[in-house]
Amino acid sequence: TAIDLSDGQIPFSTLSLQEDDVAVIAVPSYGGRVPQPAVDRLSAINGNHARAILICVYGNRAVEDALVELQDTAEAAGFHVVAAISAIARHSIVHEIAAGRPDAQDQKTLSEFAGQIKKKLDACDRSVPSIPGSRPYKNRGVSAMLPKPDQHWTLISVFPACAVSLSVRTPQERQTKSISPLSAPC
């Protein structure tokens, strides 16, 4: 079963896992944080002590506090975190950053991690990994990708009588995430 955390139409508070389930919870890191809609929606799910594997994907800049924030959010929702991975992928906005990632070496490393996680699950090892990040988390902010005018900018008005409206979507409005429960009894 797959649950799309970007789908605001899902009644997340009605979702409940079983203790012998394994959930793979994957989110992007935007500005070193988990997108707020993912935090809100994951928080509404009843994890019921299901084991959780966390994956935070970032665009080759830094994962910063996103993985530890995901851990805290998952644990507060009742999940039991047993593994965590930060994975590099092509940047979601500037596609030239980390182009070609994950590459063959990344895939090999991820495959090795998957093998280690499978062994841990098979052994019913519920130890919590040490996950990097800071508490309190860094402040949320507007993406550095948005231009910030300063004294060197010049306003040029070509059509002063026309009203122009631009829709600026924040990174939090562009995310896609999923959580996939897997059956692995312990």
Predicted segments with their positions:
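Generic detector of bulky aromatic hydrophobic side chains
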Residues: 28, 150-153, 185
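A mid-sequence, solvent-exposed acidic-amphipathic segment
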Residues: 132-160, 165-170
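FMN-binding flavodoxin-like domain, especially the glycine-rich phosphate-binding loop
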Residues: 1-8, 12-148, 177
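Iron-sulfur cluster-binding cysteine motifs and their immediate structural context
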Residues: 162-180, 186
